[in-house]
Regions:
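Phosphopantetheine-dependent thiolation modules in NRPS/PKS and related acyl-activating systems
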Residues: 1-43, 48-77
């Protein structure tokens, strides 16, 4: 799993947030478009693309895209 690919999949969950504005350090909860529906879309994307099930608490605990990436990587190990 690579960060660039993860960010591309992550960006696909948003309608108006371009992928080039997202970095590993992006605090995704602060994005204008972020909502509970987007959070569910991200959880579903991670399950579909990586076969990893995230809980709501894990989504809440992740502050940045890097945090989310690290959580997924840990579950893949």
């Amino acid at each position: 799993m690579e960060m660039k690919e993860f960010i591309e999949y992550f960006a696909d969950q948003f309608d108006d947030t371009p992928v080039d504005t997202l970095t590993p350090e992006t605090v995704f909860h602060d994005l204008d478009e972020y909502s509970s529906i987007v959070a569910l879309s991200i959880i579903a994307m991670i399950d579909e693309e990586y076969g990893v099930t995230l809980t709501g608490n894990e989504m809440k605990a992740a502050v940045t895209i890097q945090d989310l990436f690290n959580t997924v990587q840990a579950k893949l190990a």
